[in-house]
Amino acid sequence: MSPTSKIVPNIMCSITGNPKSGKTHLALTFPKPLAIFSFDIGLERVIRHFDPKDFTIHTYPMPITTSSKSKGLGKEIQAMWSKFNDEYIAATEDPEIKTLVVDTGTAVYEIVRLAKAAELGNESLLRFQYGDVYARMRGLLQRARVAGKNLVITHYLKD
């Protein structure tokens, strides 16, 4: 490391729990201001307990589907991924933002996975095609780390 390098301390945190167990509430207690990327319903229930000037909210309503495949949702999913990625990058570059909150990481993973399948013209991915999905997810973590932002990602427990 060169003598001019600056290490910016930050927190990388995953909060996992059952629905309505306080995951988002805990995330909103991190250093302000926050950029919230909400893929989950229920943010409105929690957000009213906090000062609205402390956060920027980006919402991404998940399409209703009965399949793990992107059948008929390709363009919609790709547009959602592109919008999220652009807004996430902008938040990491905003010097005012201290914390990024992704609610939920599970939803982001599904968006990334389905968007990649749509890019390839497929409804789903084969095992060897997940490299780009993992790279995109890793990129979200790395971008926050390099920018010196706190990153909080919520997840639901799975059976």
Labelled PLM ranges:
Residues 2-99, 107:
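Conserved P-loop
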Residues 99-159:
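P-loop NTPase motor core
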